[in-house]
Amino acid sequence: MIDVNSFNALKIGLASPEQIRSWSKGEVKKPETINYRTLKPEKEGLFCEKIFGPQKDWECHCGKYKRVRYKGIVCDRCGVEVTQSKVRRERMGHIELAAPVSHIWYFKGIPSRLGLLLNMSPRALEKVLYFASYVVIDPGETSLAKKQLLTETEYREYYDKFESQFKKGKGFKAMMGAEAIKELLKELDLEALTKELRNDLKTAKGQKKVRTVRRLEVAESFRKSGNKPEWMILDVIPVIPPDLRPMVQLDGGRFATSDLNDLYRRVINRNNRLKRLLNLGAPDIIVRNEKRMLQEAVDALIDNGRRGRAVTGPGNRPLKSLSDMLKGKQGRFRQNLLGKRVDYSGRSVIVVGPELKIYQCGLPKEMALELFKPFVMKRLVEKELSHNIKSAKRMVEKVRPEVWDVLEEVIKEHPVLLNRAPTLHRLGIQAFEPVLIEGRAIQIHPLVCPAYNADFDGDQMAVHLPLSAEAQAEARILMLASQNILNPKDGSPVATPTQDMVLGSYYLTLENTSDFKNDAYFSSPAEAVMAFRQKDIDMQEPIAVDVRNYEKKDFSLPENNKPSDSNLLITTVGKIIFNEIFPEDFPYVNGEKPGLNEYDWLKSGERIEDKLKQREPREAIQKGSLGDLVGHCYRKYGSTKTASILDKMKEVGYSYATKAGVTIGITDVAVPEKKHEIISDAEGKVDEVEKQHHRGLITPQERYTRVIDIWNNAKDSVTGAVMDNLDIFNPIYMMATSGARGNISQITQLAGMRGLMADPTGRIIDLPIKTNFREGLTVLEYFNSTHGARKGLADTALKTADSGYLTRRLVDVSQDVIVREEDCGETDGVEVGAITNGNEIIEGIGDRVVGRFAAADIRDRQGNMIVNRNELITEDAAEQIQEAKLDQVPIRSVLTCKTKNGVCVKCYGRDLATGAVANVGEAVGIIAAQSIGEPGTQLTMRTFHTGGVAGDDITQGLPRIEELFEARKPKGLAVISEIDGRITVKTEHNKRKVIVTPEKGEQKSYNIPYGARLKVKDGDEINAGDEITEGSINPHDLLKIKGVRGVQLYILQEVQKVYRMQGVDISDKHIEIIIRQMLKKVRIEEAGDTELLPGSYVDFFDFEKVNERIKEEGGEPAKAKSLLLGITKASLATDSFLSAASFQETTRVLTEAAIKGKVDPLIGLKENVIIGKLVPAGTGMPHYRNIDLAYNDEENEAQSDKSQDEQEIGEITVDMGE
């Protein structure tokens, strides 16, 4: 076997007949497989042991030699080499064909490679190959042209005329079949052909130019790769090893076999028949028919169904050919090379483990014993509880009592990986320290559920065991759940309390000012808590506490705003208890945010009651504020301390959710009195509108819009009434306002009215549902509400599949983007401003620049320096930028990074998952793809109509994201201006025209399509690339007008718009990485003195390199245009044929790669996974792999191993804390 680490690249090419024979261990001459009586392989058949090796280890066919001691001997009776049976997975055979046949990939692919080389149409080729016409090889003295087709009668005519020449082998010659094509290919002179084609290119135009470029490309491929064109015609066919196309006996004595064996049998049968016919000297027509059948049999073997009807097996099922073995989800690439099943794994149902620490998981005992079996056996022998491994294995299998103690020892500090499918982002696999538990379900910590998107309604999870010391170290340092607190997509905490924990914290920190009894003052927090335990005060009652005796909090922090003349803090017992979660140098949390204001302090002589009247009640802790607190802790203390704070939050949350005793009953759903009044009021208004419509005062469209408005307003009023009607301790109200479960609109549906519903097309029905679920719906109302419900379910199902496919394409396009160096030296950057929608700021400038490096010095309006060039913009700096109200800030961006095959640290900035600057080796491409793909399921699917409003529906949600990333011409296209200038709007013959007049140069006029809405008025100033009508811009047009930078920023803003509308935050840098990959290629317009072919796609960096070289030599450089490729196209245009072939269109990619003799440099992650090397990212990068460790002696070895681990963990915690 070859060692995967001993090579750096992989080359693919065409195999010559000699090469195929050299692979082979013998010729397969008979179609037989297995003898039905002896069940042994037939000699010279498809499973022959002489050719492919023995079926049983160390045993020849006739049984003369058995046992290892005869290793390597070839049996003199049966000719089988005595060796291991696994050679039957690697030894190949071959079939010598009686007549050459063409390879269907090169003849039938689009464009037909054979057709391009010979300059023949695929139709003509087909006629020749399948024996319908003759082709002239040598016209001799006839008036025919070379490569001209002749019918049978024409051929006879010429043959009779020029018989004498024909006999001598000179002059006129015409043939049919693959032999004829092979003759023509042999005669090709590639050097001359490429010269001639390059000359033709200079004059060619239109279609002819396109074809010439294509022909030149194929000819050049053959010339450069050293492949010979005649190798596209096969004389010999390789037979793949028999264990890759097995034949197994089923229970009933019947045999099941791989389809390939049937296909090979057909080829061998036809080939043998052809040989016999040729030996007998059969008539031409019979031989010809046999040759055609052989050609068809070989076609079916290589790619069944590519030409004509597919060969079917029993039950009319098309047989799976060699090509089908590679293609699709079940093919070799995606099924076995990219996704293998692994040993040391198990799966089980998950249940909640509320008493676990965040980095622990409960592992069922029997499962752990099976997973850790080898470790337990080794330990048993070490402890001399058993004498050898065999008896240790017996002990484990019999489950002796002492085994459990050893298991406890073994699993200590040995992390396991837990994975939940679907793994949408990297947080779908995390490492935990196992804790042995009884039962058969895996326990997981409630705080890691959001990351896995797990719940406990029967979800299952898989457990994997990292085996080597390195794998364990990586699992512990990088993947432990306590290290994965932040979400890589936007840097917000993902491990935040949910549901019960939120409800508990909310109940605990509520402030109830409604039934304020008396002023209560306490000398210390401990005294207040004691009074609460004695039931002297309520948990939610405002009290004043002297903070001088508060040991656990530091009130001198600036955030606490403590006045010098006051020591009394107005708070509640609940908040005192809640604040015990945080360290003493954390600001006191009295409302949503950490920190206090002047209304929280009581000066001497003031009363609590008076102070409460001056301010609104302080907010209770909701889900959002809990998340903010976690983020605050992470920035302040780093991951390890935050993890323990999270565990305390969980304890407090659950404990007080239990004490709150929140239940839900029908009486909690209180329908407000005002509801009926509001509804009858609305009905009156609707009647009024209907009357106006009947009198013809308003159009049906106006009536519809007004009715919808009336009911929407009515629903809003009802919502208000419902909320006013609920007590702050109402369980439903608490659940919704705390963010634990449900929302206001659901409360309105329970207690108010359900409101307007959409019909199946998405149009809103103007008859609302006036009742709520408490009162019950009428039959018609129930029917109306089924549309929306059904659409919701159908949408969800479709969305999941579409979103998964989008993620797959994104990963494929960006998988080779890795942080490769510290600084690429690029001086240019991108100007970034706030994202706005109309006048509303969607994302402020501070949020957009935080964690990036400045591309130039950033100063405020007074000229004071905020950030120097190439410095990281921290949270504080971002705040200063926000306060300075700067419009644009220059930052380093992935879009301008000069690193080849990746990005540099300075252009990427901060790694959002750790909050520190990214490391070299970080696989940022895949993180980007996951960050965009994972929220895809939350985006809406189809376009919603707001009830027949005129104008095209602008696509939104998932389809819009797909439209942008695939760089398609959008639906609802906007007309855009190609020049800067002033607008004039004209109407001629009922058609609207917009004329743009520039200051200099000629004006441009644009016809406005019917029904389009203008975005500009007469006399407006407009810039090139701006929209004239509403709609979406075609990115390809924008590329022509505004260039690369314009289209980059447009796609970025548009993608962000879709996600922001759904309330999903994604960092710009992720989208930038995908856009960078879409704009990586250029199309060569003029070749100059370079070797590049006009019309070919070339990587931008390679193009610049070639041009630099030509300039140095004094030649004329090539000219090229920027290309915008959709993500599917960009994935297929990658340099790696392995990555492209495993993505889509496998046969096309491999055909092209083989002709070009492509070399896969193994740069991306996918290609390395396919061939089984470590991925070149993270610790798999070359400069991490080439480190040698030297040890002094055994003892030090153990010591240094341990201390190094500790150091690394120590360092990591220090880093995080910075």
From Swiss-Prot:
<dbReference type="Pfam" id="PF00623">
    <property type="entry name" value="RNA_pol_Rpb1_2"/>
</dbReference>
<feature type="binding site">
    <location>
        <position position="60"/>
    </location>
    <ligand>
        <name>Zn(2+) 1</name>
    </ligand>
</feature>
<feature type="binding site">
    <location>
        <position position="78"/>
    </location>
    <ligand>
        <name>Zn(2+) 1</name>
    </ligand>
</feature>
<comment type="similarity">
    <text>Belongs to the RNA polymerase beta' chain family.</text>
</comment>
<dbReference type="GO" id="GO:0000287">
    <property type="term" value="F:magnesium ion binding"/>
</dbReference>
<dbReference type="GO" id="GO:0008270">
    <property type="term" value="F:zinc ion binding"/>
</dbReference>
<dbReference type="InterPro" id="IPR044893">
    <property type="entry name" value="RNA_pol_Rpb1_clamp_domain"/>
</dbReference>
<feature type="binding site">
    <location>
        <position position="907"/>
    </location>
    <ligand>
        <name>Zn(2+) 2</name>
    </ligand>
</feature>
<dbReference type="InterPro" id="IPR045867">
    <property type="entry name" value="DNA-dir_RpoC_beta_prime"/>
</dbReference>
<dbReference type="Pfam" id="PF04998">
    <property type="entry name" value="RNA_pol_Rpb1_5"/>
</dbReference>
<keyword id="KW-0808">Transferase</keyword>
<comment type="function">
    <text>DNA-dependent RNA polymerase catalyzes the transcription of DNA into RNA using the four ribonucleoside triphosphates as substrates.</text>
</comment>
<dbReference type="InterPro" id="IPR042102">
    <property type="entry name" value="RNA_pol_Rpb1_3_sf"/>
</dbReference>
<dbReference type="InterPro" id="IPR038120">
    <property type="entry name" value="Rpb1_funnel_sf"/>
</dbReference>
<feature type="binding site">
    <location>
        <position position="824"/>
    </location>
    <ligand>
        <name>Zn(2+) 2</name>
    </ligand>
</feature>
<keyword id="KW-0862">Zinc</keyword>
<dbReference type="InterPro" id="IPR006592">
    <property type="entry name" value="RNA_pol_N"/>
</dbReference>
<dbReference type="InterPro" id="IPR000722">
    <property type="entry name" value="RNA_pol_asu"/>
</dbReference>
<dbReference type="GO" id="GO:0000428">
    <property type="term" value="C:DNA-directed RNA polymerase complex"/>
</dbReference>
<feature type="binding site">
    <location>
        <position position="457"/>
    </location>
    <ligand>
        <name>Mg(2+)</name>
    </ligand>
</feature>
<dbReference type="Pfam" id="PF04997">
    <property type="entry name" value="RNA_pol_Rpb1_1"/>
</dbReference>
<feature type="region of interest" description="Disordered">
    <location>
        <begin position="1195"/>
        <end position="1218"/>
    </location>
</feature>
<dbReference type="InterPro" id="IPR007081">
    <property type="entry name" value="RNA_pol_Rpb1_5"/>
</dbReference>
<feature type="binding site">
    <location>
        <position position="455"/>
    </location>
    <ligand>
        <name>Mg(2+)</name>
    </ligand>
</feature>
<dbReference type="GO" id="GO:0003899">
    <property type="term" value="F:DNA-directed RNA polymerase activity"/>
</dbReference>
<comment type="subunit">
    <text>The RNAP catalytic core consists of 2 alpha, 1 beta, 1 beta' and 1 omega subunit. When a sigma factor is associated with the core the holoenzyme is formed, which can initiate transcription.</text>
</comment>
<keyword id="KW-0804">Transcription</keyword>
<dbReference type="InterPro" id="IPR007066">
    <property type="entry name" value="RNA_pol_Rpb1_3"/>
</dbReference>
<feature type="binding site">
    <location>
        <position position="459"/>
    </location>
    <ligand>
        <name>Mg(2+)</name>
    </ligand>
</feature>
<feature type="binding site">
    <location>
        <position position="62"/>
    </location>
    <ligand>
        <name>Zn(2+) 1</name>
    </ligand>
</feature>
<feature type="binding site">
    <location>
        <position position="75"/>
    </location>
    <ligand>
        <name>Zn(2+) 1</name>
    </ligand>
</feature>
<dbReference type="InterPro" id="IPR007083">
    <property type="entry name" value="RNA_pol_Rpb1_4"/>
</dbReference>
<dbReference type="InterPro" id="IPR012754">
    <property type="entry name" value="DNA-dir_RpoC_beta_prime_bact"/>
</dbReference>
<keyword id="KW-0460">Magnesium</keyword>
<keyword id="KW-0479">Metal-binding</keyword>
<keyword id="KW-0240">DNA-directed RNA polymerase</keyword>
<dbReference type="InterPro" id="IPR007080">
    <property type="entry name" value="RNA_pol_Rpb1_1"/>
</dbReference>
<keyword id="KW-0548">Nucleotidyltransferase</keyword>
<protein>
    <recommendedName>
        <fullName>DNA-directed RNA polymerase subunit beta'</fullName>
        <ecNumber>2.7.7.6</ecNumber>
    </recommendedName>
</protein>
<feature type="binding site">
    <location>
        <position position="904"/>
    </location>
    <ligand>
        <name>Zn(2+) 2</name>
    </ligand>
</feature>
<dbReference type="GO" id="GO:0006351">
    <property type="term" value="P:DNA-templated transcription"/>
</dbReference>
<dbReference type="Pfam" id="PF05000">
    <property type="entry name" value="RNA_pol_Rpb1_4"/>
</dbReference>
